[in-house]
Structures are given as structure tokens and as C-alpha cells.
């Protein structure tokens, strides 16, 4: 049987969208309950949000098989962000402005810029991945272990953190964003 193009595929896509939407909604409800002083209720919303995430993951990975490899996922993400930035939110801005919803139109205008930045970030990471430059640079840089904070200076991240022994996968370029 061919899933592609079937009603079942459409149902799975709808299920994924619904479970994803419910997860976010319950997360936001949890934040509200927490802000209002209801920790127990917040924990129920969070637990349910995690259940919804598990449901969405099953549909996404097991049935739709949409979670490929990291390189393909980066390209797919860049394409999605480009679509939102260049098409979808431009249209939404135009429609909101035409209907007189200036604040909402301005929101979509700003959102286009953010989504465009997301596209560029995903593409740059994709290019670095394809070039073998995720854990390697042409000059010495500071690499930071995301587990323990250890800083290594060199052209490559170490194979393992000398402090906590976590693997290279936990290293990123150190960014001093507090200056």
C-alpha cells in the first residue's frame, strides 16, 4: 500500500498538527497556571504537553518518517523558514494591513525578519556540516563544553572534554554574549 497521497496520510498530517498545537497550548496554559500560583495544575498541563509531544513524535517519526538525517533536517528547516519569511507571513501582513489590523500587520512584518534569520542560521550550519566544519575551524577559537563549561582553545574541539569526559558532540564555539 502507498501512504503518500492517501486519506490516511492526510489524517496523520492533521494528527501531527493537532498534537503539536495541543502541546504548545498546554505549555502556555502551564505558564499561566504557574504565574497564578497553581504549581500542581501547571504540572498537570506540563505532563499532558509531554504526552502530546510523544504522540506527535510517533506520527512524525514512525508513520510519516519525516525525521531524516541532520543535513536533510537543516535543509528542510531552512526551506520552511524561507517559506514563512518570503511568502506566508508577507501575505498575512498584507491581509492584516488591508483589514486595518496594523498591530498584527507589524507583528508579521517583524516575524518575517526573524524567520529570515532562522533560514540563514540553518543554511550556515548546513554548509558548515557539509564542509566538515562543525567541530573544526581554520583558526584557533574558544570551544566550550555545554555540559560543564570547560573552555578549550584550538582549531578543533577536543574528542572528549578533559574535565567531564563528555564527547565532542557537546562542544560549541564559546560566545561571550554578556559583554
Task: Go through each PLM region and give its residues.
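Non-heme di-metal
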Residues: 1-179
Amino acid at each position: 500500500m502507498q501512504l503518500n497521497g492517501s486519506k490516511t496520510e492526510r489524517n496523520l498530517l492533521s494528527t501531527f498538527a493537532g498534537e503539536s498545537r495541543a502541546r504548545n497550548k498546554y505549555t502556555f496554559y502551564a505558564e499561566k497556571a504557574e504565574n497564578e500560583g497553581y504549581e500542581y495544575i501547571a504540572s498537570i498541563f506540563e505532563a499532558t504537553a509531554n504526552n502530546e509531544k510523544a504522540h506527535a513524535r510517533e506520527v512524525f517519526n514512525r508513520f510519516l518518517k519525516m525525521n531524516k538525517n541532520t543535513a536533510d533536517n537543516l535543509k528542510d528547516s531552512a526551506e520552511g523558514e524561507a517559506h514563512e519569511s518570503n511568502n506566508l507571513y508577507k501575505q498575512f501582513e498584507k491581509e492584516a494591513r488591508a483589514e486595518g489590523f496594523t498591530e498584527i500587520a507589524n507583528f508579521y512584518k517583524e516575524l518575517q525578519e526573524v524567520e529570515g534569520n532562522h533560514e540563514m542560521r540553518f543554511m550556515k550550519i548546513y554548509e558548515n556540516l557539509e564542509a566538515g566544519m562543525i567541530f573544526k575551524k581554520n583558526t584557533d577559537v574558544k570551544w566550550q563544553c555545554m555540559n560543564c563549561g570547560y573552555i578549550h582553545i584550538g582549531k578543533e574541539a577536543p574528542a572528549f572534554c578533559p574535565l567531564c569526559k563528555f564527547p565532542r558532540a557537546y562542544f560549541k564555539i564559546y560566545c561571550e554574549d554578556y559583554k
